[in-house]
Amino acid sequence: VPKAGGPLYLYRLLAERPHDALLRALDFSGAPALPEVHRSPAQIEAARQFRQWAQDNGQSDLVALCNRYAEQSQGGTTRLLNGPTGERNSYSLLPRDHVLCLAAEERDLQAQLAAVMAVGSEAVVAESAVSNALLGKLPPAVQKRITRIADWTSDTARFDFVLHHGHPDQLRDGSQHLARRS
């Protein structure tokens, strides 16, 4: 008899899976009700303003990405799952608090920010000409959910997760640096 969360893990065994695999697993889990959503007004407003900013600036690809992330995001949700013997289990998906966004191109940074805002995390962005130009144009609610740092490699830089867009050599170097962090 499978455990209550079993269907959620089966998709991890596939070499390729549908983009909405988690949503399918949650829908077929026998959950009796819609999930409880635990997001602050600031999280909700930042995601809304980021999408609106993209729309106001004619960035239809970014708007579509924001919509897709919003539809698929399960960050901050709790679902009740029925167990094999009538027990009830809760399954919560909580976003990482601080997500380091590493991108050399503005378009890549925008995609990262769309993901971070959709799940309800706060972005940590290394200062650069590209990031400074973009961040200065963003709405206030979005800017409040972004921390700028001069040097992400500093031991004082605080983040829980990393999103990287860039050259494989940069990824390798960044991964080695992250592995050395205490």
Language model features with spans:
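C-terminal segments
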Residues: 1-102, 106-112, 119-182
